[in-house]
UniProtKB/Swiss-Prot annotation:
One GO molecular-function entry: translation initiation factor activity
Biased composition (Acidic residues): 1-13, 30-50
Signal peptide: none
Free-text function comment from the UniProt entry: Component of the eukaryotic translation initiation factor 3 (eIF-3) complex, which is involved in protein synthesis of a specialized repertoire of mRNAs and, together with other initiation factors, stimulates binding of mRNA and methionyl-tRNAi to the 40S ribosome. The eIF-3 complex specifically targets and initiates translation of a subset of mRNAs involved in cell proliferation.
Protein name: Eukaryotic translation initiation factor 3 subunit J-B
Native source organism of the sequence: Danio rerio (Zebrafish)
Any single GO CC term annotated in Swiss-Prot or TrEMBL for this entry: eukaryotic 43S preinitiation complex
Amino acid composition bias (Basic and acidic residues), ranges on this chain: 51-75
Chief site of localization: cytoplasm
Biological-process GO terms, alphabetical: formation of cytoplasmic translation initiation complex
Ranges for region Disordered: 1-75, 214-235
Subunit structure: Component of the eukaryotic translation initiation factor 3 (eIF-3) complex, which is composed of 13 subunits: eif3a, eif3b, eif3c, eif3d, eif3e, eif3f, eif3g, eif3h, eif3i, eif3j, eif3k, eif3l and eif3m.
Coiled coil region boundaries: 30-127
Pfam families linked to this entry: eIF3_subunit (PF08597)
Amino acid sequence: MADSDEWDADNFEPNEPIKIATAGRLDRWEGEDEEEDVKDNWDDEEEEKEEEKKVEQKIAEVKPPEKKKLSDKIKEKELLQKKKQEELKKNQETAASESLTLEEQLAEKARLKKLQEEADMELAREAFGVDPAAANASTTVNTTNASGIEAMCPSSKDDFVTFEKLLKEKITQFEKSVHYPSFLESLFRELCISLEVDDLKKISTSLSVLLTEKQKQEKEKKANKKKKKGVVPGGGLKANMKDDFADYGGFDGGYGNEYDDFM
């Protein structure tokens, strides 16, 4: 009996580890339930982040665009101006390379100049928000504020009168030069190439009248020089007096003959 009791005791002791192992298995399953709760929390956080992003995007869409600074506008204007000038320069080089007559070249230059002025005006309007009516009004030059020929952009008759005076003052500074006459001849010819025939006739008539007046003045100067020479050999003052009386019949066939007839 003692052996059977010992066997029973031996068989009884191993039961406790089995219970512990079973308990261990139960604890492991309980941990799995907790992990599932953590995953659910992560999903909630991700959904909240997505909602926050959507709200931020809506706020960014509703937010009005910021106004550009004046310095940024000026930089944009300079870039556009540079690009426009490069295009105009390229067009000028292309026009010069072609076989054009002098008149056609001048017309092309005038066209390109007009395009450049229009482009400058358009850039100013876009960059600074200038009213088109105000921009057109500003093309009329205020002569009191003009700083020289470069500042002139004549459009009215009075503007051209002022422009004429400034050009005259500029050009006549060099009238003492020996090259001045040839310079004017070439300048007038180049300036008059694009004119119509009727306009050329007016200019030609005006210059012809000026030539006649200058010739008349020159003759008068020569006559005055001769009178200032004084007594001329071969009769002098008496001879001149005799010539004056000769206009009224002279000494031979004038008053003397009338006196003989009376007698």
